[in-house]
Amino acid sequence: MTDEGDLAQEDTAKDEGNVTEGSRMSKLRRARRKVTKPHLCSMDGEEIAKANSSEMSRNQIADLSKPGSAESWSSHSAKDAYHPTPVVKPSLPSALAGAPDAEFSPNTDPTRYNAQSFNPPQLSARMKHIKQEMAKNHLQFVRFEATDLHGVSRSKSIPAQFFQEKVIHGVFMPRGYLELMPNPKDNEVNHIRATCFNSDIVLMPELSTFRVLPWAERTARVICDTFTVTGEPLLTSPRYIAKRQLRQLQDAGFCLLSAFIYDFCIFGVPEVINSKTISFPASTLLSNHDQPFMQELVEGLYQTGANVESFSSSTRPGQMEICFLPEFGISSADNAFTLRTGLQEVARRYNYIASLVIETGFCNSGILSHSIWDVGGKTNMFCSGSGVERLTLTGKKWLAGLLKHSAALSCLMAPAVNCRKRYCKDSRDLKDSVPTTWGYNDNSCALNIKCHGEKGTQIENKLGSATANPYLVLAATVAAGLDGLQSSDGAAAGSDESQDLYQPEPSEIPLKMEDALAALEQDECLKQALGETFIRYFVAMKKYELENEETDAEGNKFLEYFI
């Protein structure tokens, strides 16, 4: 929204840790330069890499162990509390930790949650794997992808021969690609030095997300984090915000196990697309007969590292549901982000339009099913172990936090006018708000506590719509839950034996987008957790969208581009 000079001045007190990000990125570049050179410069350089691996590792370890280095990112110290990388499972198999040329499998990679927190042997093994994948699949291009505020993938495709250089130095992209809004001088956010609003940003790839795309010919993708040209993280980046909240959760002694459940609609595509001719493919009419499309999508998602637990037809014609397997850390949001792009590309191969947009009469949900575990990922902190429908005190505190902030959460999780219709779809009364409901094993509630044994004890946050940015849904959920955990007396959670929660005032969800935006602006906890810079920008963007809301006909005209 503004240039980073302003952001640094305005948010220094609330976004501690950003000062050292520039030096960390510089260290990371140096480490990548050392490790990637023997693997990617030449297909014949493998013997040189092996001969020099011991000396290279010693030098890199000495360099990376310095304060502020890439290796120090996995530290649990308080001064690093705001670093965006959650280290959920820090232990490494001896084979990978001991040898640069150890076998690497992307689907069993133990460092997949420790993004960019690699030591030299890990980084070397990962780069070797990437080189092998590029050669085996004859890759010609690599997409460097980042999410915008709406959760849409924005990318630059790089010829494969330049991949090594871009891993080290990053890919430059105009900032306006990710922050889709006119110049802040003409809007709510007006700062003195906003002239740099249209400056470039840098996409730095997270190598753990490198995958060959089965639905794109000879193309791979890597998900990127966004930085300014001076090395600071972009404070409006949804992925950065999500990582920062996960790190806060880890510092509190927990980690997040989560998965998204999405509904989406499949439309048939006539020769001319308009609001009257878009139709449903008959084969998807409350059935699973359209297997080839769904099977190709699910198999493709698996190849990109996103494991699908199940898929089925949903409640309405042409509406499908897809459920991901739970994963620790940022992976669940990465999987949802991958789905949003892959769904579109696979659908076009079948001459379909697949849309996450909520049309009149349809309720495309984006549920975040989640639980918190101890930092080692061994114990579900929501499970009482009694075999009855009951949350632990920790679980009830977390739930109390979600209820407390539900009004502000709804703004981030149902970010469009049509999204909010689902909150009152069963009511004919004209209201300004509806209660935030919760219950045990009750799918009609906004917050549904599923007690299906120890591993199945989880909270389904059903406030979200499929159009919400998955990184923001995850970040806001963690921020609200953490506030509940950190409540001083725990009175809101009630006793450990009780199933009930004590609420001084019933939680309400605003039905109007304007009221939800006001609730978000007034929620000091979420403002501090997500950053005032982000909140200021998000609110200004939504107000601009409300002022320029398109008609249904215009929306249908460009339906194939919406997700």
From Swiss-Prot:
Disulfide bonds: none annotated. One of its GO terms (molecular function) is glutamine synthetase activity. GO terms for biological process: glutamine biosynthetic process. It holds the Pfam family Gln-synt_C. One of its GO terms (cellular component) is plasma membrane. Residues 137-231 form the GS beta-grasp domain. Residues 51-62, 105-115 have a biased composition (Polar residues). It comes from the Eukaryota. Dodecamer. Interacts with BFSP2 and VIM. This is Lengsin. It comes from Mus musculus. The gene is Lgsn.
